[in-house]
């Protein structure tokens, strides 16, 4: 299996690797998951391409299986957790300290998820010279101001996915999420720092469209914004 994976990596066959990554994650084969992600990385695949063409596609494959009732919610959750762990490992190659003098804070809107989108954002920003703090699920807004000042943050990145398990875009929570986004923008404007919003979840929030300047769907988009 590993030999086949290395062959696909050398051919840059992203489509098949995404399928294999989805399958391996669903049977909890961490060895194959790590081989695909680390193998592509070591082979010189740009981080943004690795995320856009392999990791995100694998996530979509798993999500489609969930929508079609081929797998359970728990399967999808475990799949994403395994992939997230492997992706997070890429942060070790760019520890904080190798930076361009700028500090970034990454936040997501979920309390209970291993949010792969925010982890991929952190990896990409570190590989582009940022010193990154990942606070995971949304910090209290009062806290947000003090963290920004204390850590000398230049840019804040919020990530909101639209996966079935994402509670932040469930109807009951939408107004809360929208309020959090508006409040975050106010904090950023007051402190004169850049704010980025990523993920397809934003497109489910009608009130927000057109009111946020810097949004990204792909990691190649994010790369251009930073």
PLM feature segments, named:
Residues 137-143:
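Short acidic loop-to-helix transition motifs that present clustered carboxylates
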């Amino acid at each position: 299996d590993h030999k086949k994976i290395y062959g696909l990596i050398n051919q840059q066959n992203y489509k098949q690797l995404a399928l294999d990554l989805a399958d391996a994650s669903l049977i909890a084969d961490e060895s194959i998951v790590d081989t695909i992600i680390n193998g592509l990385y070591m082979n010189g695949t740009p981080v943004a391409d690795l995320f856009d063409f392999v990791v995100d596609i694998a996530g979509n494959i798993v999500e489609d299986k969930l929508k079609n009732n081929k797998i359970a919610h728990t399967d999808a959750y475990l799949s994403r957790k395994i992939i997230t762990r492997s992706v997070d490992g890429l942060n070790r190659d760019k520890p904080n300290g190798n930076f361009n003098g700028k500090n970034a804070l990454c936040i997501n809107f979920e309390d209970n998820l291993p949010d792969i989108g925010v982890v991929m954002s952190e990896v990409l920003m570190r590989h582009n010279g940022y010193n990154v703090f990942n606070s995971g699920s949304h910090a209290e807004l009062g806290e947000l101001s003090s963290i920004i000042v204390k850590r000398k943050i230049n840019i804040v990145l919020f990530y909101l996915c639209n996966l079935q398990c994402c509670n932040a875009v469930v109807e009951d929570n939408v107004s809360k999420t929208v309020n959090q986004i508006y409040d975050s923008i106010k904090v950023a404007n007051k402190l004169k720092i850049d704010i980025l919003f990523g993920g397809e979840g934003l497109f489910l929030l009608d009130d927000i469209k057109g009111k946020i300047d810097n949004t990204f769907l792909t990691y190649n988009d994010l790369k251009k914004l930073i």
